[in-house]
Amino acid sequence: MRVLLSTCGSRGDVEPLVALAVRLRARGAEVRMCAPPDCADRLAEVGVPHLPLGRSARPAAAGEAKPLTAEDMLRFTTETIAMQFDRIPAAAEGCDAVVTTGLLAAALGVRSVAEKLGIPYFYAFHCPSYVPSPYYAPPPPLGEPPAPEGTDIRALWERNNQSAFRRYGAPLKSQRAAIGLPPVEDIFEHGYTDHPWMAADQVLAPLQPTDLDAVQTGAWILPDERPLSPEMEAFLDAGTPPVYLGFGSLRAPADAAKVAIEAIRAHGRRVILSRGWADLVLPDDRDDCFATGEVNQQVLFRRVAAVIHHGGAGTTHVATRAGAPQILVPQIADQPYYAGRVAELGIGVAHDGPTPTFESLSAALTTALAPETRVRAEAVAGTVLTDGAAAAADLLFAAVGEEKPAVPA
C-alpha cells in the first residue's frame, strides 16, 4: 500500500503524521509526505520522502506579532488551496490513500484532488472543538472579532460555517471547476469527511458526540529515544528541577520569555528556555538559565518542575504523559481547549488570556508548583494511552484493504 500524508501547518501538525508514517512503514506500506519546507530535516531523520507544501512558518513565528486581518486570511487561504491543487496531483500519483491533518485550509484542496483521482481520503484532527458539535464551541475564526459573550454554541458554529464559505468558497469553487468538479455544499464536511479520526487521548480530550461520525484513535506520538545533550544533563544535575519555558513553532507574546523568567526566578526556580521558531533569547547570562534548541521533550519533561507552553495538542500530550504540571498560555486554534482541559483535570493552570504578566505567571506558578498538582499530574500521566498511531494504521489498512501490495519497510 502506498500512502500520501499531507499537512501545511506547524510542527504540531507534522509530528503526528511522522508517528503515523513510522507505524505504516512498519506494516509494509510505502509512505511519502507533503509538508512545509521547515520539516525537511525532521522527515529525513525518519526516512520519509518529503515533498514541500505550504509556506515556511519560521519567519512568521520569529516576526513581530501583528493581528491577522480578514484580508490576510483570504490571501493565505487562496494561496494555500491553489498550492494544493498544483502539487498534490503529482505527489498522490500511484497512491492508494491520502491522509491529511491540520486546519480546514490544509484539507480542502487535498480532498478535492483525491476525489478527482479516485483515491480514498482520510482526515484526522487533534482537538474536539475542530468539528461541529453541540458540546464544543469552535475556535474563533482567525482575523475576525470574537462573538459576543454567551453566544449559543450552535450559533457559533453557524458563524464559523459562514466564515469558512467567505474564505474558502470562491477559491475552492474556482479550482474545482478547473479540473471538472462541481462546487461543494458543506465546506467542513468536504475537508473533514463524514467519518474523521480524532488523534487525541481519551482522557485529555474526551470526544463527545459530534455532527460527524468521528472515531477517536488516541494521540499519534512517536516514541523519542534521543538522549539529552551533555550540557543539558550537566545543567539538570547541577540543581533542583527547573521550569521549562517554550512556545514551540508559534510566535511568542511580546517579552514573554523575559516576564516568565522573572516570575520563575521569583519562585526560586531555575529555567530551561526553548528558543523555538520564535528564536527566544535569555535576558542575561546568569547560570540559573539554560537555552536550548531542538530537544527530546519526552525525556526532558520527566525531569522538570513544571512546563510553561502555548497549549498545542502535541506539547500538551507529551507534558501530560510525562506527569509534569503545566501552565498553558493559549494563543489560537486548539490551545484554549487544551488549556481548559489541563485546568479541569487539576494537572496545571490555564492562563487567562494570551499575554502573560509577572503577576499572572507568579500566581500560576504557585498553583503549578504545589505538591498536590504534581501528585495529580503523575496520576493522570498513567492513564494516557500511547498507541494512537498504531490504531490509525489499523483503521487505514482496514478501510483501504490488506490486499494492496506491500513494500519493504
UniProtKB/Swiss-Prot annotation:
One GO term (biological process)? carbohydrate metabolic process
Give the record's keywords alphabetically.
Antibiotic biosynthesis, Glycosyltransferase, Transferase
Q: Which cysteines are joined by disulfide bonds?
A: none
Output the Gene Ontology terms for molecular function: hexosyltransferase activity; UDP-glycosyltransferase activity
* SUPFAM superfamilies the record matches: UDP-Glycosyltransferase/glycogen phosphorylase
Q: In which pathway does it act?
A: Antibiotic biosynthesis; vancomycin biosynthesis
Q: Identify which top EC class this enzyme belongs to.
A: transferase
Q: What is its EC number?
A: 2.4.1.-
UniProt keyword annotation of Glycosyltransferase present: yes
* Coiled-coil residue windows: none
Q: Extra notes? A: In A.orientalis different glycosyltransferases are involved in biosynthesis of the vancomycin group of antibiotics. GtfA (AC P96558), GtfB (AC P96559) and GtfC (AC P96560) are involved in biosynthesis of antibiotic chloroeremomycin, while GtfD (AC Q9AFC7) and GtfE are involved in biosynthesis of vancomycin.
- Function in brief: D-glucosyltransferase that acts on the aglycone core, transferring D-glucose to the phenolic hydroxyl of OH-Phegly(4) to form a devancoaminyl-vancomycin (DVV) intermediate in the biosynthesis of glycopeptide antibiotic vancomycin. Also able to glycosylate A47934, an antibiotic with a teicoplanin-like heptapeptide, but lacking sugar residues.
- Family from the record: Belongs to the glycosyltransferase 28 family.
Q: What is this protein called?
A: Glycosyltransferase GtfE
**Which source organism?**
Amycolatopsis orientalis
Lineage summary = Bacteria, Bacillati, Actinomycetota, Actinomycetes, Pseudonocardiales
